[in-house]
């Protein structure tokens, strides 16, 4: 905080870019339970990592240098050692990514009926392929584990979001609110003149774009990310477009502009397995051609599909095998000399990516779809403003949607009753961790050192009631982007780290359920025990401050 000349105050944010990894637990601690336990309870994850921020000798931000020193901030969070219990105050400070709690009933219905089913089906297909290859080869497991978790995380989210939207009948709740909203609009002549047809316009817009939205989601799932080779081809295609705009008909390999494209095989040298990528491409192309109208494919894809006798799987595999974009050695050899734009465009993977373009799917193929998409964009924005004012008029406390800016959510440690006859305690223990131990399941493996330490039951000052608490639940309101956010008690002391939500609250993007929403946190005492006892890194604790 710096004081200006006129006496007011202005916030100044410094960005420290020299941030170094100090340590992180193995997957058998940090990711214990894997995607099986994801969004579930009880969990037993030691999900944390330690970083140290470096600065110049005056404590100012600086680029990486061997001369930099650890930053010594004036204030740091103190670590609480007393543990948590039901009803204890808890607040989370972090950077939640996005919510859409002013979405119309039409938007919620579209998500529930169009987007989420497509996401779940396609990502489970990709997960099946990854799992098969990961089980075949430990190297592939290492290279694709992050990708697999990302797919699992979002697929599970979409699946449970739909279950929650149906369970709580969120569309019907929004429709009932919109009936009251319409009456409120019509009760005032100025409001009626400006927004009297707002809901009608939304209904028309969503109906007009229904098919386009379905096609767009299949496009996203098939062409934006599953195949690294296809991403390489897309990068090449983008550069060809640049050459055309410059009225150049050849790629000169030693030109400054072309160097990034010539070096593009680097993407195929990191976390890439050709056999895996080939299967991913084929599966997504099959899904795309089976569900998207032929007129949306583009001429090249249509021709390649027909040449393969209508066999999309065979077509995709043949394109992959013949392309320089799928093999780093082939790529480097191809761009070892100058190439004409026309010649490069004959590569089958480049032809695929140029045939199926994002503009075709975001713009729509007819005027009705284009008008529908434009109408929805304008009307949803206005709808959010009007709904905000309407809810405020009903005395409801309002707050803006999450947008990756810092937010604070407050609540308390709470158990969970997710359904009839089912009760979950608010805390999980090390006993549950060992109950799940299974040496034959990668996600539930426990290494020898961890098993020996647990058998000794030496919890030090981190234990309570002759056990070690691992995770706990709060009723805080978080979303994607909050992972790693500090969880504080009423004195501002660190009691844990938020890392997950629960399945029963997955409608939280559009509708928050206060009785069922839970934040899953790692108990800070478990973090300290792992550092102290498992890692035998007690010197790191000397750098921390502990609440008395």
Predicted regions and their residues:
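Short, basic/aromatic beta-hairpin or loop at an interaction surface
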Residues: 55-70, 463-470
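Single conserved hydrophobic/aromatic residue that forms the stacking wall/gate
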Residues: 2-7, 11-12
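Cationic-aromatic interfacial patches
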Residues: 109-341
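C-terminal subregion of chymotrypsin/trypsin-like serine protease catalytic domains
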Residues: 92-145, 491-548
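Active-site substrate-binding loop(s) of clan PA
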Residues: 34, 70-85, 425
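Charge-dense, extended regions
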Residues: 254-470
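Catalytic nucleophile loop of clan PA
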Residues: 78-88, 477-498
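Short, structured beta-strand/loop micro-motifs enriched in basic residues and often containing a Trp
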Residues: 66-76, 408, 475-478
């Amino acid at each position: 905080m710096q004081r200006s000349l006129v006496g007011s105050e202005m916030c100044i944010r410094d960005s420290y870019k020299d941030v170094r990894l100090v340590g992180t637990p193995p997957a058998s601690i940090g990711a214990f339970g894997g995607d099986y336990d994801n969004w579930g309870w009880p969990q037993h994850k030691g999900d944390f990592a330690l970083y140290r921020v470096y600065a110049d000798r005056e404590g100012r931000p600086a680029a990486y240098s061997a001369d930099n020193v650890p930053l010594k901030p004036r204030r740091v969070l103190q670590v609480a050692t007393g543990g948590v219990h039901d009803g204890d105050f808890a607040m989370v400070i972090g950077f939640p990514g996005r919510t859409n709690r002013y979405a119309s009933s039409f938007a919620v219905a579209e998500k529930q009926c169009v987007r989420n089913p497509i996401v779940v089906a396609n990502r489970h297909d990709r997960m099946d392929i990854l799992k098969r290859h990961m089980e075949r080869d430990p190297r592939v497991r290492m290279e694709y584990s992050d990708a697999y978790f990302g797919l699992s995380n979002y697929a599970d989210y979409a699946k449970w979001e739909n279950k929650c939207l149906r369970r709580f009948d969120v569309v019907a709740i929004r429709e009932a609110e919109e009936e009251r909203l319409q009456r409120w609009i019509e009760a005032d002549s100025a409001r009626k003149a400006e927004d009297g047809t707002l809901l009608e316009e939304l209904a028309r817009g969503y109906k007009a774009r229904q098919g386009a939205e379905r096609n767009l989601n299949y496009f996203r799932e098939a062409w934006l990310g599953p195949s690294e080779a296809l991403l390489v081809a897309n990068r090449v295609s983008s550069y060809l477009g640049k050459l055309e705009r410059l009225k150049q008909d050849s790629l000169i390999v030693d030109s400054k502009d072309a160097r990034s494209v010539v070096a593009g095989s680097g993407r195929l040298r990191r976390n890439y397995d050709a056999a895996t990528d080939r299967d991913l491409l084929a599966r997504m192309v099959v899904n795309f051609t089976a569900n998207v109208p032929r007129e949306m494919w583009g001429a090249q894809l249509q021709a390649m599909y027909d040449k393969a006798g209508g066999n999309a799987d065979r077509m995709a595999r043949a394109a992959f095998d013949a392309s320089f974009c799928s093999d780093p050695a082939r790529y480097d050899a191809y761009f070892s000399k100058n190439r004409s734009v026309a010649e490069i465009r004959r590569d089958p993977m480049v032809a695929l990516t140029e045939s199926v373009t994002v503009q075709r799917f975001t713009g729509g193929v007819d005027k009705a779809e284009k008008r529908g998409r434009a109408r929805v964009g304008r009307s949803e924005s206005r709808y959010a403003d009007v709904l905000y004012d309407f809810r405020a008029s009903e005395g409801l406390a309002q707050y803006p949607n999450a947008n990756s800016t810092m937010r604070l959510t407050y609540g308390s440690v709470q158990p969970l009753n997710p359904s009839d006859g089912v009760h979950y305690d608010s805390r999980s223990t090390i006993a549950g961790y060992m109950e799940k131990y299974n040496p034959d399941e990668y996600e539930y493996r426990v290494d020898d050192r961890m098993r020996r330490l647990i058998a000794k039951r030496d919890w030090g000052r981190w234990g309570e009631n002759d056990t070690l608490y691992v995770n706990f639940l709060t009723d805080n309101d978080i979303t994607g982007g909050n992972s790693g956010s500090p969880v504080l008690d009423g004195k501002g002391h660190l009691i844990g780290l938020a890392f997950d939500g629960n399945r029963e609250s997955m409608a939280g993007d559009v509708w928050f359920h206060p009785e069922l929403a839970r934040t899953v946190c790692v108990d800070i005492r478990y973090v300290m025990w792992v550092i102290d006892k498992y890692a035998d890194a007690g010197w790191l604790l000397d750098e921390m401050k502990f609440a008395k």
